[in-house]
């Protein structure tokens, strides 16, 4: 059994780690108000940012998919690890030594499973890099030199060599304290007929790293004709760490420049990435052992995008027109917001970036990227023959138009579709631009009728904001609409006390559960009370955690996290006055209900038969109305807008 991590270490690590820096390794964040950052959610596909991080409170929350929690929850979710492994990862990040206690072997006490696999891969990368300097690795060095990659380039990209020995790496790593089961789980070793053996032999290797810079696998290139494994390239198999659908070579090196320049360049191979980076195109990445897919796209979009408007560029560099055309045509069926800002670059002679750099130098690669074509244009023009052919053959002109109109009609953005229709007239040499535009619109309308019908039939079921069919009534009731103006003071009051308990403190604690008319908000108020109230002296991420622990309802716990992260739209210097005003407004609403009850009771009483009681209650009413007026004055000066 793994030694237990003391609570004091868990709290200390959470306190020292900056959640915005951790999340920033995976998501590009931009300021969105006081102590609020936002970006595209890494846990579901979205076009507009609904993922928020509150640095001072140490929490995140997505208003699109409801994922949320502290920095440990984020690492658990994004890296698919246990809580213990998340703590260990963050401890490594800040150099914190965990003082485990309880029974455990020395290896178990040292690390959890994921961390052990990361450590094994890192040790393997160092072993392979050292082996690249050996005499046996001369063919690997020659392969790199022939492509104009010197020793410095090899070190920069972590290139290595797998020796010919049956179990050279395996024996080395076992001597360093790793177990064979760990090496097998990491994809570094496997069980052979003669016992444990290395996975890679006599191959040039590239380490594949995560956004956070952790080695999780390798790509290996065949060098020798007598290599029994005929595949030119092989990769680490699917492991706990290595998922080929979501890893990219070079992403660790390109990440910062992708974020800074709002641009990513996607190439097809390891040497292409190396060539691009060395030529100054430092945003180049490549998929590993599989085609570029949705998860790769989602990762790059999170780095490129920074607000509700998609400002980035995704540039695909292909070896030839056929590959580029196939990829471009797929864009019409995918996310066209991305496709509309995607580009294709193909060298005139069909050379890949590595060969182009060899033949024409670094400037040729920079020019290749600079001369990119919009993906929609590339796809459409791939269906149109050379202009001279069209001039000489009227039938070819008609055929080109017939092929191209349906493709242009698939563009869903009306303005963009019309613009490409006009361009299509020019590309095909069609003199009547209006006729082409009308044809495209007619085709688009024909296609849109079944599409609109389909969308109507699934819109309710697929809405991310709807409860699943058959959801319990109490769950539906406990899910308040954040846009409901009648509930706005209650929501703002709860946000204030969860995010700034010191400011909300004593006044909030005077509010009863009955002040919160929505069951969900009332349940949150009850949880705050059970946690000791706003004046308990607990602040930051710990305060929200303590409140969340007071409920057994996952829905209410999620609501607590949501309220603890949702931005309060006011400048820091105005926060105290704003919170006072919010609480005053909520008190005023509650006081209004109390006054209505007193008035109703007075109407049922006789001032003659119940004189003393009547006059006493009337005096209370006068005092209550005076207090309500003071609350109204306080609330009216809070600079709030509902």
Swiss-Prot record:
- Tell me the Pfam families matching this sequence: DnaB_bind, DnaG_DnaB_bind, DNAG_N, Toprim_4, Zn_ribbon_DnaG
Task: List the CDD domains hit by this protein, alphabetically.
Answer: TOPRIM_DnaG_primases
Task: List ligand-binding residues for Mg(2+) 2.
Answer: 319, 321
Membership in a protein family: Belongs to the DnaG primase family.
Q: Name one GO molecular function term.
A: DNA binding
EC numbers listed for it are 2.7.7.101
For activity, the cofactor(s) needed are: Zn(2+); Mg(2+)
UniProt domain comment: Contains an N-terminal zinc-binding domain, a central core domain that contains the primase activity, and a C-terminal DnaB-binding domain.
Record function comment: RNA polymerase that catalyzes the synthesis of short RNA molecules used as primers for DNA polymerase during DNA replication.
User: Catalyses which reaction?
Assistant: ssDNA + n NTP = ssDNA/pppN(pN)n-1 hybrid + (n-1) diphosphate
Name of the protein in question: DNA primase
Naturally occurring in which organism (per UniProt): Mycobacterium leprae (strain TN)
Q: Which SMART domains match?
A: DnaG_DnaB_bind, TOPRIM, ZnF_CHCC
Subunit-level organization: Monomer. Interacts with DnaB.
Question: What keywords is this UniProt entry annotated with?
Answer: DNA replication, DNA-binding, DNA-directed RNA polymerase, Magnesium, Metal-binding, Nucleotidyltransferase, Primosome, Transcription, Transferase, Zinc, Zinc-finger
User: GO biological process: any one?
Assistant: DNA replication, synthesis of primer
Q: Which residues take part in binding Mg(2+) 1?
A: 268, 319
